[in-house]
């Protein structure tokens, strides 16, 4: 397999013709020209991501400080383990995205990857703010490192981490494609049992500030999911030779593995011990998401019978909406948080 070449940073011989631009294997000048983009969707993505700017510390966690010691034992354990999982995922994303960007030869897509990397930093900041606010430094450090001291967490992280490390050792297009699929799975599957747990706490009148932090993170992750879906679908058009029957089957198994791991994680960390959630709800919802992510790439559903959002989980979409206007005495600002409104004109 031919090794991918890392793009040069200074390239006077790069081709400025947007018609010849490619996602990988192109000859880029690295010039950020907002008026000449090959991929029209980048303009909308960029604007949406920039409009999503938020600051974790502007969300009031005073009620969470009171709620955290009163959580049921199962709720508190789940809160700690899920936070440990999420902070590790966003940390490894921050470290890995530049590795992908080094081989992306569409400069407008690299702009998107740079914004994503910044947002992953904000997410890590958010988790740190949550932990610093609600627990002691000793408890904080214990929670942070459960990602490697808890065998279930370590097993989960190994699946994605090994895939990322593989590209460190083997720089070819099929391996890069697998890394992109791993990103897609992480952004579109791996977070969702955890997100659902926080929304369920809020639904039960607990940890509302934490849930609001997660809403903004969830909103960002939706744009990251959109980004990697589009990168993969552009590669399907530009380099169909990467998507052989064997390759697609391998990607399919990656998606299925991601779904099954997320279900197993939900069983372990949530199970039937959290009021408002149970194993059946988790498994139905994650299989539905697996179908949604896989069919969005143009392939048949993985799990027949799970093509529609489960009725038992329809509330998740409402609680995940960061733009719902809801204010109360304890909140510093409306949850319809936006630094700017979307502009009508294009970039």
Q: Which stretches of residues belong to each language-model region?
A:
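Non-heme di-metal
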Residues: 2-347
